[in-house]
Amino acid sequence: MTRLNILMAASECVPFAKEGGLADVVGVLPKYLAHMGHDVRVVMPLYSRIDPERFGLERLPGVLVVPMGIMGNQYCGVWEGRLPGSAVPVYFLEHEGYYGREGLYEEDNVGYMDNDNRFIFLSRAAMELPKLIGFAPDVFHAHDWHTAAVPVFLNTLYRDDPLVGGAASVLTVHNMQHQGNFYPGAMEVLGIGWEHFTFLGLEKDNQTNLLKGGLYHATVLNTVSEGYAREMQTPEYGWGLDGVVRARSADLVGILNGVDYEEWNPETDPHIVANYSRSDLSGKKLCKRDVQRFFGLPERDDVPLFGLVGRLVKQKGIDILAEAIHRILALDVQVVMLGAGEPWSHFYFGDVRNEYPEKFGLYIGYNNGLSHRIEAGSDFFVMPSAFEPCGLNQMYSLRYGTLPIVRATGGLDDSVENFDEQNLTGNGFKFWSHDADALFDTVGWTVHTWYRRKDAMAALIGNAMAKRFTWEDSAARYEELYCRALRKRLGVGVFVRRFGG
């Protein structure tokens, strides 16, 4: 088919700025789409943490004029760089007033008071950028609430724009919990008219809800797993917008994220003390001792080691782990944790470490190299999430022969196959109830399997390491989604004439 012009608008992108999995997708997916022959470009803020010299950014001539409704025109500089290892352009919006801050979204766990202006600006700038760079997008791809106003603008203020008005829009929801809820006055900054501040528009609970606007206006929608696409349509996981999602269910698909196997490969990983493969696991034992040594635990081969890497917040199930941890540590096991999050968890698990110094290791913060070492050295990886749109660590764990223990939700349920003791199939362990008892019972099941079923452990590890989640597959599905959006936007006849199928 003919090459598509795709403009991705996002609030974060690896390696420039990252707070969550959104950044990983935006930093990798464009490369694979470019490999398929498409012209993909990314636009994001130039946060103060992004060093133009370090990333080889160049400032483009001219100034981007960004209309901001009642606030009038605002102006920003535009810098251009590349996604590392590719020719994919990334455009950075330089606005000191909005993005010259320590955090991306918040400071001291408090969201910035002007986040509505900051990200309405990002969305509106994404609509104006094509004029500056001479690029005519066929598809605008927005991510989460931060750029959910892009499809809103495309369907309203830019509907008849000669450069971008014919483009389709895709909105990817990475997390329904975060919606961009602001005072009604945000409508004045959007500048699209109060007629859109309705139940069938951007209004929710008498506030301006940017995600809701995007869900209504995007040509098509997707999220990052088929399981989460179903869950978003329920009151439990829809966070008050499940009715909107159900109304758009015919236009919603789930596309599981891929894994960058160039970075996450135990055969070549430079972060781990010894490399290993599915056919030769000897190096994994050395990796286990390395992790035990780092955390000051006894270097034992004869005890199962459980790892956890991630944000220490309730969404990730840290509350039920806290409730179960003493019962877990009463077993003959070791547990190591790497992460940061809710302050209470730092103190709580710090006390657990002091109480069980030979069984429990803790590292508060984030350390990429250590996360690789924990994935390689652990026997099991714990992910007791309350909800998980996709999740990546369970996929890393499978590649490293570290069996995931997951709550069956969202992408965790999609990517992990539960152990079948009779047939020795599966590649991990699942539980369904989000409570400490279910977590503890499943850990007990894994401990029993570790000590009493060596045949099962060998089969599970082999199954796990054979599983693949490639970005090639994910990118092909996004290409299908873009074509679907264009057929809907333009009509099948126009689409075929322009793009050839």
UniProtKB/Swiss-Prot annotation:
Residues bound to ADP-alpha-D-glucose: 18
Enzyme Commission numbers on file: 2.4.1.21
Gene Ontology cellular-component annotations: cytosol
Superkingdom field: Bacteria
UniProtKB keywords: Glycogen biosynthesis, Glycosyltransferase, Transferase
Enzyme superclass (EC): transferase
Classification via SUPFAM superfamilies: UDP-Glycosyltransferase/glycogen phosphorylase
InterPro entries listed in its UniProt record: Glyco_trans_1, GS/SS, Starch_synth_cat_dom
Keyword Glycosyltransferase: yes
Record keyword Glycosyltransferase present: yes
Pathway: Glycan biosynthesis; glycogen biosynthesis
GO molecular function: alpha-1,4-glucan glucosyltransferase (ADP-glucose donor) activity; alpha-1,4-glucan glucosyltransferase (UDP-glucose donor) activity
Annotated Pfam families: Glyco_transf_5 (PF08323), Glycos_transf_1 (PF00534)
Gene3D superfamilies reported for this sequence: Glycogen Phosphorylase B (3.40.50.2000)
Catalytic activity, as annotated: [(1->4)-alpha-D-glucosyl](n) + ADP-alpha-D-glucose = [(1->4)-alpha-D-glucosyl](n+1) + ADP + H(+)
GO terms for biological process, alphabetical: glycogen biosynthetic process
Function: Synthesizes alpha-1,4-glucan chains using ADP-glucose.
Family, per entry: Belongs to the glycosyltransferase 1 family. Bacterial/plant glycogen synthase subfamily.
Protein name: Glycogen synthase 1
